[in-house]
């Protein structure tokens, strides 16, 4: 699973996920992409589950590009622990997703196969997504 190798600080504040994606909004590595149309967060497990769904469907053909990385730690307190006594320990990592962000890209596969693979991957994700193709000149 994806997670940062080391961080300057172990814990991070909650923050707010606002705005739309301006960086990472175009298909730039592959021919086809899976783009988020909704705001949310993806855990490292969800990113990996979708990647596995894509790679199983395209078998040996093509190349997958993961355009997101879970770099935000989410802390949790253990079950049945009283309030107070500080913040919980980091349990997992998430990637904050804005609308318009390209999540995955595929190269070297036909369009119909890419569509099917991205449909399977989208079922593993908690966000609404859309299929996009590369605009030449970008």
From Swiss-Prot:
One record GO biological process: translation
Superkingdom, taxonomy of origin: Bacteria
Keyword Transcription: no
SUPFAM superfamilies in UniProt: Ribosomal protein L16p/L10e
Assembly and binders: Part of the 50S ribosomal subunit.
Family: Belongs to the universal ribosomal protein uL16 family.
Protein name as it appears in the record: Large ribosomal subunit protein uL16
Taxonomic lineage from the root: Bacteria, Pseudomonadati, Pseudomonadota, Betaproteobacteria, Burkholderiales
Encoding gene, per UniProt annotation: rplP
């Amino acid at each position: 699973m994806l997670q940062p190798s080391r961080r300057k600080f172990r814990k991070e504040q909650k923050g707010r996920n606002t705005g739309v994606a301006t960086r990472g909004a175009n298909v730039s590595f592959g021919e086809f992409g899976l783009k988020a149309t909704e705001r949310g967060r993806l855990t490292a497990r969800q990113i990996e589950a979708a990647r596995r769904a894509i790679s199983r469907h395209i078998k040996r053909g093509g190349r997958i590009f993961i355009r997101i990385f879970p770099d935000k730690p989410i802390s949790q307190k253990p079950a049945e622990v009283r309030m107070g006594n500080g913040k919980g320990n980091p349990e997992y990592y998430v990637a904050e997703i804005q609308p318009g962000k390209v999540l995955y890209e595929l190269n070297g596969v036909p369009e119909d196969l890419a569509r099917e693979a991205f449909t399977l991957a989208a079922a593993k994700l908690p966000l609404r997504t859309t299929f996009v193709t590369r605009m030449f000149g970008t």
